């Protein structure tokens, strides 16, 4: 499993899900946000075999990757446990361990499509978790709040024609 800023989830380089987050103000005392809301959409299954090759190469599901036996409840429980572990680590040790873990799983050498059609080059995360991008020739830090306005959320299509998310 790998990630692409700001929130695309890949299984074996196929798009499988999307995470969106929003947060409250960051405490100057702890460096942690006062609150955070996380939304996740994950393609659990789908009839990929009948789809065009290009679609199958770009998309996948838990079922396609051999994990279709995992129930929605167990998946949600596992995600919540992992999220709380990393949130606790952030509170106790600062953002650095979270930064390192995320960076190790991030897709490398990626060009990101901005909602207005421009392309941004992915450079990495800064110490506060903002995405560092090269946009219009300039290096910029894009906060979590700004990323929601800058990037369109990927559509988890069931088929090339549907546009419907599972």
Locate the predicted segments by residue.
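Long, positively charged amphipathic alpha-helical accessory segments at protein N-termini or as interdomain linkers
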Residues: 11-166
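Conserved kinase catalytic-core segment
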Residues: 1-15
């Amino acid at each position: 499993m790998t990630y692409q800023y700001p929130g695309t989830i890949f299984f074996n380089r196929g798009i499988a899900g999307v995470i969106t987050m929003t947060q409250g103000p960051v405490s100057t005392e702890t460096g942690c946000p006062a609150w955070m809301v996380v939304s996740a959409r994950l393609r659990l299954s789908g009839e990929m075999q009948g789809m065009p090759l290009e679609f199958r190469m770009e998309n996948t599901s838990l079922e396609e990757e051999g994990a279709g036996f995992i129930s929605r409840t167990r998946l949600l429980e596992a995600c919540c446990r992992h999220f709380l572990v990393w949130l606790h680590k952030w509170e106790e040790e600062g953002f650095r361990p979270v930064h390192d873990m995320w960076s190790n799983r991030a897709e490398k050498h990626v060009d990101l499509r901005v909602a207005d059609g421009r392309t941004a080059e992915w450079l990495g995360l800064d110490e506060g978790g903002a995405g560092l991008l090269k946009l219009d020739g300039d290096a910029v830090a894009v906060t979590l709040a700004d990323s929601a306005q800058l990037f369109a959320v990927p559509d988890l299509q069931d088929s090339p024609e549907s546009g419907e998310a599972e």
